[in-house]
Design a protein with these regions (language model features):
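Short internal beta-strands
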Residues: 30-43
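Short, glycine-rich nucleotide/cofactor-binding loops
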Residues: 5-15
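Histidine-anchored nucleotide/phosphate-binding helix
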Residues: 14-28
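Ser/Thr/Gly-rich flexible loops in soluble cytosolic domains mediating phosphotransfer, phosphorylation
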Residues: 96-124
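Mid-chain, well-packed structural core segment of small domains
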Residues: 62-102
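General beta-strand structural signal in soluble alpha/beta enzymes
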Residues: 7, 34-36, 56-58, 82, ...
Length: 124
């Protein structure tokens, strides 16, 4: 099974994803992380991503969600971590549907908040 995770977040919850990454950096060292360029840029503003194995794909606004979805459909991803905005407000640049659907089709674990993301990387 591949050991690559897709990490993604709506703009309003990128800080929460960054905090979660920081709190789980040791666990994440065992994975390759696929993150869209624009999400990665937002995460890098507030967080040190240091020793993590990160591969970026094009930004969400440039079709990065589609690129990540294709990677999921090819069977190259072991899990999806996407933090959507809990208020239902969307930044307009990050969509979860193009990522969730291929993850469902490929029977991948999906995490939508810090608690489920921690469970996913711990193998629960």
């Amino acid at each position: 099974m591949p050991s690559t995770l897709v990490l993604n977040a709506d703009s309003s919850v990128c800080p929460a994803l960054g905090t979660w990454i920081g709190n789980n950096a040791e666990l994440l060292k065992g994975f390759s992380l696929l993150i869209a360029e624009d999400v990665l840029a937002e995460l890098s503003k507030r967080n040190t991503l240091g020793q993590l194995s990160i591969t970026s794909c094009r930004g969400i606004r440039s079709g990065g969600d589609i690129e990540m979805a294709a990677t999921i459909l090819k069977g190259e991803i072991s899990g999806l971590i996407h933090f959507p905005s809990p208020t239902g407000e969307r930044a307009g640049d990050v969509l979860s549907e193009p990522l969730v659907r291929p993850a469902l089709l490929n029977n991948l674990p999906i995490a939508l908040n810090p608690a489920s993301a921690s469970a996913l990387v711990r193998g629960i």
